[in-house]
From Swiss-Prot:
The gene is rpsN. GO terms for biological process: translation. The keyword Ribosomal protein applies. It comes from Shewanella denitrificans (strain OS217 / ATCC BAA-1090 / DSM 15013). Belongs to the universal ribosomal protein uS14 family. Keywords: Ribonucleoprotein, Ribosomal protein, RNA-binding, rRNA-binding. This is Small ribosomal subunit protein uS14.
């Protein structure tokens, strides 16, 4: 079980990512556009650096919705492999069952 503070930190990061997504995308478009002048590009770089560090999508970590476990996360279900197996064995995941061949 992950600490409550880690879960809260990840929730805050997710909020920041959605809040600054449009602004970050616009600045990156200015930076990567070949027609942009050097001065405008430099201003965009400085503005991008001034944004909160946690607003970057690469800082967000996928976590299990039940336990907060960061490893063994399956996106399709939003659970870690351990909790997914437990739910499958209880028959709570439709269309999913233990493999047998």
């Amino acid at each position: 079980m992950a600490k409550t503070s880690m879960k809260a930190r990840e929730a805050k990061r997710a909020q920041l990512v959605t809040k600054y997504a449009e602004k970050r995308l616009a600045l990156k478009a200015i930076i990567s556009a070949p027609a942009t002048s050097e001065e405008d590009r430099w201003d965009a770089v400085l503005k991008l650096q001034a944004l909160p560090r946690d607003s970057s999508l690469s800082r967000k970590r996928n976590r299990c919705s039940q336990t907060g476990r960061p490893h063994g996360f399956l996106r399709k279900f939003g659970l870690s492999r351990i909790k997914l197996r437990e739910a499958t064995m209880r028959g709570e995941v439709p269309g999913l069952r233990k493999a047998s061949w």
